[in-house]
């Protein structure tokens, strides 16, 4: 199979439909992970999956798992934990720390992490540009001091939030962060959350599968529409419990 090599001076991607037709979803390979290439990738439903020997591999997945914020489902056991209220959720309080924890988290059936140092640097750049955001769940420890317990990060373009990775140091911490983040993002105007892959974890939150063509059309429309206000850095209240 011939793998498309992406030009260093051109951020355009081949049509993901061709990669999906081959079943593997590999759209192309690049020698860089520039912010401009990352943003162009997300706008087209493409994301970097891993790197090898200095090359970055870009994929598209279809059908695409997504969460529509107005259809968010909170599992009963998690709703009970949320009502307990012993946690605190914030956005963009410690982005670099969240990414580092995601990189260090053990994953089933994975040897190591795809979030290599080059990826961490790239997403930190997107964070500095106002595109990448982290949601953090904090719990009090035995001394009563509040500490980071879990969270996730992703990229926001227009009214789409592209989820990337989660971690949890305490049970349910990443789930709490997600359950609070979705209504918060919806209030700001986010209409679609990209989960990339279909997993049991996201199905519990009501994720749905979209044909890639439908997903890509939604991106085309929603990426161009700005949020009602910037995500910023603040506390996030859990709503609708």
Swiss-Prot record:
<dbReference type="GO" id="GO:0030163">
    <property type="term" value="P:protein catabolic process"/>
</dbReference>
<comment type="similarity">
    <text>Belongs to the L/F-transferase family.</text>
</comment>
<comment type="function">
    <text>Functions in the N-end rule pathway of protein degradation where it conjugates Leu, Phe and, less efficiently, Met from aminoacyl-tRNAs to the N-termini of proteins containing an N-terminal arginine or lysine.</text>
</comment>
<dbReference type="GO" id="GO:0005737">
    <property type="term" value="C:cytoplasm"/>
</dbReference>
<keyword id="KW-0012">Acyltransferase</keyword>
<dbReference type="InterPro" id="IPR016181">
    <property type="entry name" value="Acyl_CoA_acyltransferase"/>
</dbReference>
<keyword id="KW-0963">Cytoplasm</keyword>
<keyword id="KW-0808">Transferase</keyword>
<dbReference type="Pfam" id="PF03588">
    <property type="entry name" value="Leu_Phe_trans"/>
</dbReference>
<dbReference type="InterPro" id="IPR004616">
    <property type="entry name" value="Leu/Phe-tRNA_Trfase"/>
</dbReference>
<dbReference type="InterPro" id="IPR042221">
    <property type="entry name" value="Leu/Phe-tRNA_Trfase_N"/>
</dbReference>
<dbReference type="InterPro" id="IPR042203">
    <property type="entry name" value="Leu/Phe-tRNA_Trfase_C"/>
</dbReference>
<protein>
    <recommendedName>
        <fullName>Leucyl/phenylalanyl-tRNA--protein transferase</fullName>
        <ecNumber>2.3.2.6</ecNumber>
    </recommendedName>
</protein>
<dbReference type="GO" id="GO:0008914">
    <property type="term" value="F:leucyl-tRNA--protein transferase activity"/>
</dbReference>
